[in-house]
Curated annotation (Swiss-Prot):
Domains: entry comment: The J domain is necessary and sufficient to stimulate DnaK ATPase activity. Zinc center 1 plays an important role in the autonomous, DnaK-independent chaperone activity of DnaJ. Zinc center 2 is essential for interaction with DnaK and for DnaJ activity.
Record's protein name: Chaperone protein DnaJ 2
Domain J span(s) in chain numbering: 8-72
One GO MF term: zinc ion binding
The keyword Nucleotide-binding is annotated on this UniProt entry: no
Entry similarity comment: Belongs to the DnaJ family.
Originating organism: Aquifex aeolicus (strain VF5)
């Protein structure tokens, strides 16, 4: 779905934009009870709940919520990342109960039988990791590789991320492997999903290594390539380097938010660079040539034409930043500033203040009068 047609996440959950995390969780719990497919059997409930779950996954995560508040749905689409940050997999109702109420629906079975129950869970995509990275303008010009240290969840090596031990399974004693129970008599019968195995027909024991979580935590250094021409605020993605998916689901992605430090000489606007140079008043009148630096290390000579005005821009083609999308480079603009000396400085240099003042008055008489008010 295009970002222009997607509903506002706050509107989906029915909360204001300044809602607290507790208000967001409360709204989500209310919608779970109304629309979760395990509760609501209407065909439209599944798509509705996917929308609700996606909104909650973003607004309940402070980093993702910050990006969403700044850029809207575009924060997780298009430039840089090229991936959508969303969770359309529907977590089982017991997983939600565990998250909000610290309640395991299987605990009743465990207390009654004295052994852990571990049904097959529905796979869920792993959470994304968002990391800010600061680089210099020179690094943005040339491109660079930066090491990113992250602590991420990885699939359990013992169970492969499923959370259960397939070698230790048995037919459900309640339903006999059918996945449903039948109550009533020959005249009237009610069929319902087996409460012991959740409709699977088989009971699996939790993995001993991860105790059913399906993942473990590891610290990892990931080298991320920053392309030449990257802009401040650009989003880059390393696919599959987020947190592990739940119960065999695909992993999330690692998102890099690039911050380019301000430069002491150059100002950047898009793919163009701006540099300020000072010239004297006679140079402005007569014209001159100045040498200016560039980010590729060379210096270029720029001609200042006679009659140059304060703040005038002189374009040096092809000496700006590399274009991130496309070939070539932007332009370098030299912004001219005229250093007008005070009369006291001229008097010291020439040794006669009155003579300097007379010369300036004579010059003022012959020069054309400028328009005082500048029209934009």
């Amino acid at each position: 779905m295009a970002s222009s047609t997607k509903k506002d996440y706050y509107e989906i959950l029915g909360v204001p934009r300044n809602a607290s995390q507790e208000e967001i969780k409360k709204a989500y719990r209310r919608l779970v009870r109304k629309y979760h497919p395990d509760i609501c059997k209407k065909p439209e409930c599944e798509e509705k709940f996917k929308e609700i779950n996606e909104a909650y996954q973003v607004l309940s995560d402070p980093e993702k919520r910050k990006l969403y508040d700044m850029y809207g749905h575009a924060a997780f689409e298009g430039a840089g990342a090229q991936q959508r940050v969303e969770t359309t997999e529907i977590p089982p109702i017991e997983e939600i109960l565990r998250e909000f109420f610290d309640f395991d629906i299987g605990s009743i079975f465990e207390r009654a039988t004295g052994r852990r129950r571990a049904r097959r869970r529905r796979s869920v995509k792993g959470e994304d990791i968002v990391v800010p990275v600061e680089i210099t303008l020179e690094e943005a010009f040339k491109g660079t590789t930066v090491p990113i240290e992250v602590e991420r969840e990885v699939p359990c090596s013992a169970c492969g991320g499923t959370g259960y031990d397939e070698s230790k399974s048995r037919t459900c004693p309640t339903c006999g492997g059918r996945g449903e129970t039948v109550q009533g008599n020959w005249f009237f019968q009610v069929r319902q999903t087996c409460p012991t195995c959740g409709g699977e027909g088989v009971i699996y024991e939790n993995c001993h290594a991860c105790t059913g979580r399906g993942y473990g935590l590891v610290k990892e250094t990931i080298k991320v390539k920053i392309p030449p021409g990257v802009r401040d605020g650009s989003k880059l993605v390393v696919e599959g380097k987020g947190h592990a998916g739940r119960y065999g689901g695909p992993p999330g992605d690692l998102y890099i938010i690039v911050k380019v430090k301000p430069h002491k000489i150059f100002e950047r606007k898009g793919d163009d660079l701006y540099v300020d140079v000072n010239i004297t008043y006679p140079e402005a009148v007569l014209g001159t040539e100045v040498e200016v630096p560039t980010l590729d290390g060379e210096k270029v000579k720029v001609k200042i034409p006679p009659g140059t005005k304060e703040g005038e821009l002189i374009k040096v083609p092809g000496k700006g930043m590399p274009r991130l999308k496309g070939s070539g480079r932007g332009d370098l603009y030299v912004r001219v500033h005229i250093d007008v000396p005070k009369i006291g400085v001229l008097s010291k240099l020439l040794g006669d203040g009155k003579k300097v003042e007379e010369l300036l008055k004579q010059l003022q008489e012959v020069l054309p009068k400028p328009e005082r008010i500048v029209e934009r």
